[in-house]
Amino acid sequence: MKKTVLALSLLIGLGATAASYAALPQTVRIGTDTTYAPFSSKDAKGEFIGFDIDLGNEMCKRMQVKCTWVASDFDALIPSLKAKKIDAIISSLSITDKRQQEIAFSDKLYAADSRLIAAKGSPIQPTLESLKGKHVGVLQGSTQEAYANDNWRTKGVDVVAYANQDLIYSDLTAGRLDAALQDEVAASEGFLKQPAGKEYAFAGPSVKDKKYFGDGTGVGLRKDDTELKAAFDKALTELRQDGTYDKMAKKYFDFNVYGD
């Protein structure tokens, strides 16, 4: 009798898992901004590459669904998600109170501190006094744009928003910007450690404000896609527990990108 009950319990458990996966779409369209190396970019062949891409592909594999990546400007990602043009966002998307009013998030993917970069030797610091009269580049729709607009733009700082990060770096190196505010890791790995960024460096400490920058990044999802959120969370927990996350992270970073 006990063996029969155990067998039935196992069958019920397996059936529940199968039903859970069956509720997911066969293909998950994931939106990402491909100008944000090393998280998301394209190689010479036009293939999607980066830490976000690796994470997304691994989670989809464990969820038993097919991932389709969709390139987009950053500020179009949430509108595209809400319009059902994509099913998820994996693009260094910070988990903030404001965004959670519009969409849902998975558990944390990794930390996301923000920091200024400027020419080496520049006295610029992330303070109003230092930035007054200066031109500061930010990514449209980003937490950095929201912070700069509320704290600097109305007080004498020229905050310039761009459709993608590559345009910011281009104007910075051309001298049209005095500084740029963006994700610290993206700035370090995607610009400062590259040939184009050799004459630039971080300007001052990280900019801290939980109201704007939240508690790390997550997968952006529609609020009613509860099964998809649960599946992403389960897959993320598994790959962190079995060491896959750390193995993938070491491909891109020489520090703990997940944070505390």
UniProtKB/Swiss-Prot annotation:
Effect of mutating D52A: Shows a drastic decrease in arginine and histidine binding affinity
SMART domains to which the protein is assigned, alphabetical: PBPb
GO annotation, cellular component aspect: outer membrane-bounded periplasmic space
Keyword Disulfide bond among UniProt keywords: yes
Chief site of localization: periplasm
Note: The 30-fold reduced affinity of the protein for histidine is primarily due to unavailability of one ionic interaction of the histidine side chain with the protein which is present in the other three complexes.
Subunit structure: The complex is composed of two ATP-binding proteins (HisP), two transmembrane proteins (HisM and HisQ) and a solute-binding protein (ArgT).
Designated name of the protein: Lysine/arginine/ornithine-binding periplasmic protein
Name of the encoding gene: argT
